[in-house]
Swiss-Prot record:
GO terms for biological process: G protein-coupled receptor internalization; nervous system development; positive regulation of ERK1 and ERK2 cascade; signal transduction. The keyword Zinc does not apply. This is Arrestin red cell isoform 1. One of its GO terms (molecular function) is angiotensin receptor binding. It is found in: Cytoplasm. Keywords: Cytoplasm, Sensory transduction. It comes from Oncorhynchus mykiss. Pfam families: Arrestin_C, Arrestin_N. Belongs to the arrestin family.
Length: 407
């Protein structure tokens, strides 16, 4: 692969190989003030096109029920956003300046290639998948973004799988460069028949954690009451706000520790507990929110959702947050608990170079981008420094394929 380093481009063709879509990436980042534009190129066989038009659609959909329950004309799916772009013949009012990658692809692919553009609205949710149960089949519930390209005389014409291209992209967020303040919370509890109180203070070592990183929870108890703390329960909880027809919140523990540490009357206690929330220990929990999936490789717990304007009621989809709960189990009832919110996300990846000079000879094979799978030999000449990759379909545990054969 050392001689094929360069600009990587994702491609996917229709089953009849007459329509092919090219995209420079599959993950589009929400920067809070704007979202990466979706710009690509569609290549159509001129003999197949004839007098038809070329359309590309971008759809953001929320599936909130199993696909096998879609009966009697009822669908457990709501389209949150649909945008249509006519790539050919082009509409003058919709034309935009081509990106550098589009210009290079158009030059490479010839006159039968046409650019398309989409702008993802900021109020749309990020891609999230709800973990299916062991017996679930069909498409998993969650929010996904799909691009579909096809040829038709009009947009209302029925679209057939064999002559259209469907591919799933993701809207993602990465960890902010400046994390928030260190979480700390305290509470004081008074008990009946006790003159003095119990004081609980809990804190985390930081506010922002990356996936797979251990979380240190510092617990400090000052027990001046006559009660005895029998044990402590520390848990990491995922909260998923489902914003659709109405707002509902679901919580699920993703890591927990139960310690038999006792705090007797008129004593103090201090200890640091460590928890690491991972998907590996939660694979059987149906409905757990996961990061949107694009390929057969594994995913992870859903990243925290960062909302620019928390008062915006137009945000639909699934909003994910995390909290650490510290609970003191007190003798004869009257438990005491506090919660510490934190952020769980991926770090912003290092930007890869757009292209490598032809004269540069790598010492070893370049690392494979995690977005790239199923390497395909580049049949084009090397002068434009392109590497074309097949665009893999969405797969999940217990999830069937699209049933449209690639060429």
């Amino acid at each position: 692969m050392g001689d094929k380093a360069g600009t990587r481009v994702f491609k996917k063709s229709s089953p009849n190989c007459k329509v092919t879509v090219y995209l420079g990436k599959r993950d589009f980042v929400d920067h809070l003030d704007q979202v990466d534009p979706v710009d690509g190129v569609i290549l159509v066989d001129p003999e197949y096109l004839k007098d038809r038009k070329v359309f590309v659609t971008l759809t953001c959909a929320f599936r909130y029920g199993r696909e096998d329950l879609d009966v009697l004309g009822l669908s457990f799916r709501k389209d949150l956003y649909i945008s249509t772009f006519q790539a050919f013949p082009p509409i003058a009012e919709e034309r935009k300046a081509n990106s550098r990658l589009q210009e290079r692809l158009l030059k490479k692919l010839g006159q039968q290639a046409h650019p398309f553009y989409f702008t993802i609205p900021q109020n749309l949710p990020c891609s999230v998948t709800l973990q299916p149960g062991p017996e679930d089949t069909g498409k998993a519930c969650g929010v996904d973004f799909e691009i579909r390209a096809f040829c038709a005389k009009s947009i209302e014409e029925k679209i057939h799988k064999r002559n259209s291209v469907r591919l799933v992209i993701r809207k993602v967020q990465y960890a902010p460069e400046k994390p928030g303040p260190q979480p700390m919370v305290e509470t004081t509890r008074s008990f009946l028949m006790s003159d003095r109180s119990l004081h609980l203070e809990a804190s985390l070592d930081k506010e922002l954690y990356y996936h797979g990183e251990p979380i240190s929870v510092n617990v400090h108890v000052t027990n001046n009451s006559t009660k005895t703390v029998k044990r402590l329960k520390i848990s990491v909880r995922q909260y998923a706000d489902i914003c659709l027809f109405s707002t509902a919140q679901y919580k699920c523990p993703v890591a927990q520790v139960e310690a038999d540490d006792q705090v007797s009357s008129s004593s103090t206690f201090c200890k640091v507990y460590t928890l690491t929330p991972t998907l590996d220990k939660n694979r059987e929990k149906r409905g757990l929110a996961l990061d949107g999936k694009l390929k057969h490789e594994d995913t992870n717990l859903a990243s925290s959702t960062i909302v620019k304007d928390v008062t915006n009621k137009e945000v639909l989809g699934i909003l994910v947050s995390y909290r650490v709960k510290v609970k003191l189990v007190i003798s004869r009832g009257g438990d005491v608990s506090v919660e510490l919110p934190f952020v769980l996300m991926h770090p912003k990846p290092t930007e890869l170079p757009i292209s490598r000079p032809q004269s540069a000879v790598p010492d070893s094979d370049p690392p494979i981008d995690t977005n790239l799978i199923e390497f395909e030999t580049n049949s084009f000449s090397q002068d434009d420094d392109f590497v074309f990759e097949d665009f893999a379909r969405l797969r999940l545990k217990g999830m069937a394929d699209d049933k449209d054969d690639d060429c």
